[in-house]
Amino acid sequence: MGETKHILKRSEQKKENMWSTEDIFASDEAWKAEFAAIKGEEQALAAYAGRLSESPEVLLEYLRKSEELGLRIEDLYNYTFLKNDEDTKNTVYQGLKGQMTGYLVQFQQATAFETPEIIAIPEETLQKFYEECPELRLYERYMYRVRRRKEHILSQAEESILAARSEERRVGKECRSRWS
């Protein structure tokens, strides 16, 4: 008969074999401080609704703010999901993951206008924007990728409804995976 292998607990692992979540946030308190700092930032982006085609400067300003917030959200998300995956029975990280997921729904609802508005900008107008504001070209690839999905994009209202329902879908999936 074969030898039974002992599966190491996280506390028994060598540090070099573990994720270095402290490279993202030094502590849970640092994560909580950053999470508190971004709460409401999605509303600053929502203020651009109906304005993205106003001028190249407005579009560039929105894209920069969205990118900056997106990177901050990505760090928050990665930290909570990695910490949760370290020990899926740890209720502290289940809670942080739940908070983060809830915030993502709010963010998606607040920015549901982005894709439909970018798609609605006529190609000639967009080319004119690039000429008037060369810095906007930094986002040219992004704009192309958004616009090529035109046939598959819903209206702002429909995108917002889908964003709102994503929390319900996530909870169902999480329950299934936890009990599997």
Residue ranges and their predicted role:
Residues 1-176, 180:
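A well-structured
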